[in-house]
């Protein structure tokens, strides 16, 4: 689309590039995790019609991968998956802000790692709701040998050429979607502190420009300070809690 191309040239990013970046980084992080811990179990929250679960089951046939969504979407997704594979598991449903969420964790083996994924979700929650979600994940996941949470977040666009335009667009999105879409954090350290306070012990904030630069040339030294906002529209977070092995 001409507007997308203009944004990529003049703003340094667009919705198209942003979606591709976050999806690619989350997939890369999850693939690395599976290769490091082949026994990892996966729970993806609010995945909608994303084909990620299907793709990963094709790539890793023995993976225990479940999805959680709103009741109506869960029915639609279950039907779609089972048309492709009659053995595809049913998409689960629960309120992630109540103890109903805890029941979902009981369906996984605590002697194995658990990875939780969400994409395009947490900017729709205000800070108190986000904190409640994170505390629920760390509380209900405390008995697992390892607990990982992979998600994306839109930081305040303070270093973007069209920061005011993006802010206005986000307010419009908030009204149109009747949600709390907002920007919560300016720099990676604010995110790390917020996640630490919710019970995570390891928090890595991945900025796409540095990530793809470093992956393109492993001998290249990145000049971006990982503690500063590098200007990307979206970041990926890999938060974890790992038990000390005896």
What are these regions (language model features)?
Residues 1-45, 50-246:
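Alpha-helical subdomain
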């Amino acid at each position: 689309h001409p507007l997308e191309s203009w944004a990529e040239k003049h703003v340094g990013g667009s919705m198209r590039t942003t979606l591709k970046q976050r999806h690619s980084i989350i997939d890369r992080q999850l693939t690395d995790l599976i290769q490091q811990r082949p026994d990892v179990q996966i729970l993806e929250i609010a995945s909608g019609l994303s084909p990620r679960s299907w793709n990963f089951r094709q790539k890793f046939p023995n993976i225990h991968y479940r999805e959680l969504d709103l009741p109506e979407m869960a029915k639609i997704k279950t039907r779609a998956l089972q048309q492709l594979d009659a053995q595809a598991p049913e998409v689960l449903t629960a309120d992630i802000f109540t103890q109903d969420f805890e029941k979902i964790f009981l369906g996984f083996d605590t002697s194995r790692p658990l990875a939780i994924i969400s994409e395009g979700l947490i900017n729709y929650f205000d800070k108190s709701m986000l904190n409640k979600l994170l505390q629920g994940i760390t509380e209900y996941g405390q008995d697992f040998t390892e607990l990982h949470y992979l998600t994306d977040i839109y930081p305040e666009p303070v270093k973007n050429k069209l920061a005011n335009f993006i802010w206005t667009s986000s307010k419009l999105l908030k009204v149109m979607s009747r949600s709390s879409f907002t920007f919560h954090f300016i720099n990676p350290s604010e995110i790390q502190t917020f996640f630490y306070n919710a019970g995570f012990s390891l928090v890595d904030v991945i900025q796409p420009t540095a990530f793809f630069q470093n992956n393109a040339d492993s001998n290249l030294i990145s000049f971006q300070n990982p503690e500063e906002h590098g200007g990307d529209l979206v970041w990926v977070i890999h938060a974890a809690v790992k038990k000390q092995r005896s």
